[in-house]
Amino acid sequence: MSQQKMRIHNQYVKDLSLENPNSPFLSLKEVPNIDVMVNVNSVKLEGSEGTEGESEEKSFHEITLHIEAKAMIKDENIKDGVAFICETKYCGIFSVENFAELSTEEVNRALFIGGPTFLFPFAREVIARVTSSGGFPPLMLDPIDFEAMYEQQSRQQKSNASNENFN
C-alpha cells in the first residue's frame, strides 16, 4: 500500500449569511439556546496539476463544510424566538495523491474526516466574526469529532441498505 498524501490548494467562503430578524427589539438578557447543524460534502473536480511526464496520479476534490447555527431565545416580545441564524459553506480544494491505489474507504476517510478537520477552525472563526458583527457575542463553536460523525453516518447508511434488502 502506498503512502496517502492529501494537500490543500485553496480555501474560501462559498456562502455566508447572517439573519438577524428581531434586532431592533431583541435584548439578550438570557443566554440563547444554540442549535448547530453540520454537513460535509465532497465533489470530485475535473483537471490536473503538474508537469509533463509526472506519473503520479492525483484526484482533486472540493470539500464543503456546511454549518448552520440557529440561536433561539424565550422572550414574549419576540414571536418566533429567533435571535439569529448564521450559515456558512466553507470550502477547500484538496488533492489526494496515489488516488488509484487507495481503497474507497481510505479515500472517504481522507475526504470526510481529514478535509473538514482542516477546514473547521477557519469556518469557526468566520462564524465568530460574523455573529459579533451582527451585535451578538462571538459564537465559538465547540470542536467537532469528524471521525465519529463519519462512523455514525457509515453505520446509518449500512443499516439503511440492509433494511432496503429486506423490503
From Swiss-Prot:
GO terms for biological process: protein folding; protein tetramerization; protein transport. GO terms for molecular function: unfolded protein binding. SUPFAM superfamilies: SecB-like (SSF54611). Transmembrane segments: none annotated. InterPro entries: SecB, SecB-like_sf. It comes from the Bacteria. It holds the Pfam family SecB. Keywords: Chaperone, Cytoplasm, Protein transport, Translocation, Transport. Its main location: cytoplasm. GO terms for cellular component: cytoplasm. It is found in: Cytoplasm. Belongs to the SecB family. PANTHER family: PROTEIN-EXPORT PROTEIN SECB, PTHR36918. One of the proteins required for the normal export of preproteins out of the cell cytoplasm. It is a molecular chaperone that binds to a subset of precursor proteins, maintaining them in a translocation-competent state. It also specifically binds to its receptor SecA. This is Protein-export protein SecB. It comes from Wolbachia sp. subsp. Brugia malayi (strain TRS). The lineage of its organism: Bacteria, Pseudomonadati, Pseudomonadota, Alphaproteobacteria, Rickettsiales.
